[in-house]
Amino acid sequence: MPELLNPAPVAHLRHLLRAHSPLVHCMTNDVVQTFTANVLLAVGASPAMVIDPREAAQFAAIADALLINVGTLTEDRAVAMRAAVEHARQAGKPWTLDPVAVGALTVRTAFCHELLALQPAAIRGNASEILALAGMSAGGRGVDTTDTAAAALPAAQALARRLATVVAVTGEVDYVTDGERVLSVAGGNPLMTRVVGTGCALSAVVAASAALPGDRLENVAAACGLMKQAGAIAARQGGPGSFIPAFLDALYQEVQG
């Protein structure tokens, strides 16, 4: 039975982000790079977008955490991502997988399954992506989910147990599990789905949280809670055009205020 996330882990995550300011190596998609960087800065982390295959592996060992987001995957980018993950592992740095549109497209599906053998510290995806990654579904409609997070929870638990990782399946309610414990995170606002990049940016905050000390399950769930709280505040502006700056302001005020 999922346990509702209480406010204490979110408050603790705010403190940890301020205290540690983790450097997050974001190998993310072209559509969301600026927004992702701004979200990380707003929560007190430090972003870097190093993608060249000649540099990515070296930087992965320097950063505190690595994010792999396959949204705009290319052959060269896959080479760089694979090398970065391998070097992050060798350096003992946690890496997070965002399996964008897995199941819907064959190349990225095969690539993400290959990366699973390299032990991600956390996985963050929508319901259809998590179901596909666990081998329980063919995937959603491109980057959009066709399933509910609750329906994908058994797949998330199975994936977490198999890989000894933390899996966050996000939607109207987010579920975060290590295979045994399950935390549910309510809140947010539907406007979060009407702008590009909130899920991808969440994955970056998850990556940052995975690098922090303490209970990784609670840290990842708190990252989801932090984003949902900011989304609910920003939605008071009334539309997607004003949502993004209000969202960044809300995140900053939550963590730094």
From Swiss-Prot:
EC number(s) given by UniProt: 2.7.1.50
Record has Metal-binding as a keyword: yes
Binding site for ATP: 124, 170
Catalyzed reactions per annotation: 5-(2-hydroxyethyl)-4-methylthiazole + ATP = 4-methyl-5-(2-phosphooxyethyl)-thiazole + ADP + H(+)
GO BP term (any one): thiamine diphosphate biosynthetic process
Source domain of life: Bacteria
Pfam family, one: HK
Function: Catalyzes the phosphorylation of the hydroxyl group of 4-methyl-5-beta-hydroxyethylthiazole (THZ).
Protein's name in the database: Hydroxyethylthiazole kinase
The species this protein was found in: Klebsiella pneumoniae subsp. pneumoniae (strain ATCC 700721 / MGH 78578)
